[in-house]
């Protein structure tokens, strides 16, 4: 019996994929599904060698032959072929921490839909810890400490990455949850629907997954096309929650498009104006009253500049 399926989208990153596979124990109840997203020929040859030298007995490789390219399409292919009772997602440039399996298997005989685990993060070049995981670790910390409605809503709808979550496979199938076929933020609506439909869930303070930061990943690549994809997904995200949550819950989340507007400025006036019109058309508020406070604006601007300068070396 396969208890756990680990689904990994891959594109041109065989060396880090090798590291990820080495972080997974070779147990009979684990299957690993790698879906290649039309890698370049050079990397396909390396991938073939990796297949031949792997120690994992339940390692399966698939190719994305659909008419959609991207991690979302690859993850959907992985879900279609997964046999495990539980699902973990991983990105090819990340890895699991030693002992992760002992933590996740504790939940195999439970009735949870989802179990959230804390991640950590490192700079791939220096090996130093980064801040990429902090938002998600804080969501878990706040929920475990406060356990109130606000911390629960934030855990459900702000933990928008697919990794560091153990998800019941039958829960995914029952609710027909899939990843979007978009260039960026393909995981946001998947995670949002997981948060909405789950009934029984748990949060663990054990760290099982390390996400890396490196040059050229989608999270550190600046392009108008990626911004527009994220903007459209944000509109879908906002609309879904507005239509499905009750008024009090939706208001508690305090969603607004301030961040999207600020991001659009990087690409010039026309993208900014286009984003403004699109957001207004969908009746998404641009800010909360606190942004009228000049001290808040200055503090926010300083934080944005600091973050940009800190991440500059990763940008293409």
Predicted regions and their residues:
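Short, well-formed alpha-helical segments that are part of the catalytic scaffolds
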Residues: 10-26
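Membrane-interface aromatic/basic loop that binds lipid-linked glycans or pyrophosphate carriers
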Residues: 26, 49, 267-316
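Short beta-strand/loop segment that forms part of the nucleotide-sugar
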Residues: 30-41, 61-65, 92
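A conserved acidic beta->alpha catalytic loop
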Residues: 36-47, 68, 97
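Glycine-rich, basic loop-to-helix element that forms the pyrophosphate-binding segment
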Residues: 65-82
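Donor-binding/catalytic cores of nucleotide-activated saccharide
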Residues: 71-76, 92-197, 201, 212-225
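Short aromatic/hydrophobic "clamp" motif used to bind/position activated sugar donors
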Residues: 87
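Catalytic core of nucleotide-sugar-dependent glycosyltransferases
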Residues: 207-215, 220-248, 269-283
